[in-house]
């Protein structure tokens, strides 16, 4: 019923949308998903908070700047999309949703993240791109199961050394920031598979050949004087990428990566939890 709900709501004028949902949506959708993206909502209809078995809630592309405390009732929620809204601060009620695996916060007005974010210890994917972050909040380094971090299009100049704690992190997207050097902490993260530092101000790249898990490095649109050296089988996207990679120092299967894996804006259909 989640998809049918979206289709029905599309025929309701935006100023009547919230009233319609409150009065007519009486049962939780069978697929345990509610998608209210692009509905010009200024507040979350409280009735949604009564669907305690809800797993996926998409609120992207609205006019939200706060969330009701009743959202805490959704303790089975695994995916929450709040991107493309007007949040200047992350509502603390989000940090009570301890089953969250995927959290989309991109394209808001966030300058920081609350310490309470550390409570989301099941979080595996965090998108905080296109906000107003001048530094990566250290609380992110406490999300020990995090596998994917998208922090592109902010104003980051460096990364905290504590990031090395994230031993499950496989993909980090840092394009469109203010990095003047390749973040040293990434050299101590051997399990990283994808590193994107496109569109920064990095002039000199260190060798990445010692990172055994690396599959793809994107470094285009930097004023660099060299290409990062990588092990054989690692894909590079950027200037001088045709140079011969260094031989891999350990045996292992070569996994091909295509240019299609370069980060892009969040898709209309968000990925499922792993």
Positions of predicted regions on the chain:
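The feature captures the LRR N-terminal capping module
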Residues: 1-152, 157-161, 171, 184, ...
């Amino acid at each position: 019923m989640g998809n049918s709900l979206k289709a029905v709501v599309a025929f309701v004028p935006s100023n009547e949308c919230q009233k319609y949902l409150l009065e007519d949506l009486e049962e939780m959708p069978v697929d345990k998903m509610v998608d209210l993206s692009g509905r010009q909502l200024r507040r979350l209809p409280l009735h949604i908070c009564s669907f305690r078995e809800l797993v996926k809630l998409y609120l992207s592309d609205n006019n939200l700047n706060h969330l009701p405390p009743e959202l805490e009732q959704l303790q089975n929620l695994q995916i929450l999309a709040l991107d493309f809204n007007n949040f200047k601060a992350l509502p603390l009620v989000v940090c009570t949703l301890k089953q969250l695996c995927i959290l989309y916060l991109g394209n808001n007005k966030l300058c920081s993240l609350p310490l309470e974010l550390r409570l989301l210890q099941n979080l595996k994917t965090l998108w905080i791109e296109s906000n107003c972050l001048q530094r990566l909040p250290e609380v992110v380094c406490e999300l020990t199961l995090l596998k994917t971090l998208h922090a592109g299009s902010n104003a980051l100049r460096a990364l905290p050394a504590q990031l090395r704690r994230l031993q499950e992190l496989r993909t980090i997207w840092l394009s469109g920031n203010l990095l003047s050097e390749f973040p040293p902490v990434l050299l101590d993260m051997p399990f990283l598979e994808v590193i994107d530092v496109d569109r920064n101000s990095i002039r000199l790249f260190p060798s990445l050949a010692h990172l055994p898990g690396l599959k793809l490095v994107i470094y285009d649109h930097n004023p660099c004087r060299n290409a990062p050296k990588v092990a054989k089988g690692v894909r590079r996207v950027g200037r001088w990428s045709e140079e011969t990679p260094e031989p891999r120092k350990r045996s292992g299967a070569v996994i091909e990566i295509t240019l299609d894996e370069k980060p892009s804006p969040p898709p209309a259909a968000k990925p499922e939890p792993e």
